Amino acid sequence: MKSIILFVLSLLLILEKQAAVMGQKGGSKGQSPSGSSQFPHGQKGQHYFGQKDQQHTKSKGSFSIQHTYHVDVNDHDRTRESQQYDLNALHKTRKSKQHLGGSQELLNYKQEGRDHDKSKGHFHMIVIHHKGGKAHRGTQNPSQDQGNSPSGRGISSQYSNTEKRLWVHGLSKEQASASGAQKGRTQGRSQSSYVLQTEELVANKQRETQNSHQNKGHYQNVVEVREKHSSKLQTSLRPAYQDRLQHGPKDIFTTQGELLVYDKNQHQTKNLNQDQEHGRKAHKISYQSSHTEERQLNHGEKSVQKDISKGRISIQTEEKIHGKSQNQVTIHSQDQEHGHKENKMSYQSSSTEERHLNCGEKGIQKSVSKGSISIQTEEQIHGKSQNQVRIPSQAQEYGHKENKISYQSSSTEERRLNSGEKDIQKGVSKGSISIQTEEKIHGKSQDQVTIPSQDQEHGHKENKMSYQSSSTEERRLNYGGKNTQKDVSQSSISFQTEKLVEGKSQIQTPNPNQDQWSGQNAKGKSGQSADREQDLLSHEQKGRYQQESSAARNIVITEHEVARDDHLTQQYNEDRNPIST
């Protein structure tokens, strides 16, 4: 009697293996539902469990081992069960690898199958053990829903009385029941019970995380990657693609506790610029990008804005300014005072948005925080009156510290603050040069120059982008050269302004000095750094003007500037210091 039972059992095992390998749909109709659990021990004739359908996976670099265990349809504690089940996950993967390697040992109450799936989705949701002979369509393999893997519906429906239907060649699973009691329980239930899937870390999928970060726009593997870094098992009854849909439209997903924001759109970067206006250092995303946006906006000088991280050069805008009248130039610089963090754009978009905001471009400057380029307005501004110039300077008074992008991004936003570009020089810390404004201001009347300088006094420390970037803080204050060039060591750019000053009359330079001086007297607050700036201005600026400009006018200008440095630089430093600190 015993030998007959063994023979029948071995025969059933052979039939089941053939059904699993060939994908037949009727391999186990004649077998008893408890045949897999009656004689689990001591039978070497049952070595077929060890071979376990070694079909090679054609999926990309990974196979999913699904530890399945049975849960009621109405069971709300499956998360708790999944956590309990998680303790044995690593041990089961080891066993599964051993048996997939061809070991002939019998695993008690466990059945494994390697995928024969050609699907690109590496994670397969679960078959339903349905007593009625039909499988739920809701929890089938998402790869089947995508049409990428062979369907296992008919197979699972015919294997409904046994747990060997887990061998369905569309689904790679490992029976998670640690005892025959679960099998008996599953078979005893007339209701459909869901087989939850617990996914485990695969060495190849940690690589997929890197690939998904590189792709940044492809979220097919986001769920797998996210769950694998957290080393958690997926126990949701929902198909995997639903989780992808939840996370797909969002650019933010956590990997290893890091918040990765993938905003490639300029509109998103515009929002970041707005956030900077509120004091958010959103551009601080990667200090490594370190935009050295050197904008030497002198009339003839093309601003080679080197976004070193992105290597784009915005020479065009400066050329446009060449044909503009001096009045326009000053206006444009005032617009910059309004807080052209636009040039900062967003290092992500890496487009150097140079906004030569000509006279009255207040509205443009508001949009400037959004990274829009206001080059068009400059041409329109050509016909504008000097009164418009003063207006944008007032707008700057509102305190656009926008240029203060993020010292980490170290984008040197040069703000061509027209008259009294003290604030620009403050922002010079990122190497932005306010030479342009000085040149522009030359053609303007002393009144106009003084007005924007006062606006700057209102605290355009916006240019004060990031002291870390250590961009040369060359502040070539327009007339009178209040050039409190703190970072004189970095003042390689000051040549331009001096040359431009050569064509200017000496009378113009002292007058704007007075204007700026009068405007700054009322607003000076703290002169902590006055001594340093005076020394730098007195020595370095003189040397620069003498070397950089061969004309005698430049020398005269420096003399006037040096005469007033004591009084002007103190006030100017006082204006900068409270804001910078």
From Swiss-Prot:
Keywords: Repeat, Secreted, Signal. One of its GO terms (biological process) is antibacterial humoral response. It is found in: Secreted. Residues 1-23 form the signal peptide. One of its GO terms (cellular component) is extracellular exosome. Residues 138-157, 174-194, 324-333, 366-396, 481-497, 505-529 have a biased composition (Polar residues). Participates in the formation of a gel matrix (sperm coagulum) entrapping the accessory gland secretions and ejaculated spermatozoa. PANTHER family: SEMENOGELIN-2 (PTHR10547:SF6), SEMENOGELIN/SEMINAL VESICLE SECRETORY PROTEIN (PTHR10547). This is Semenogelin-2. It comes from Pongo abelii (Sumatran orangutan).
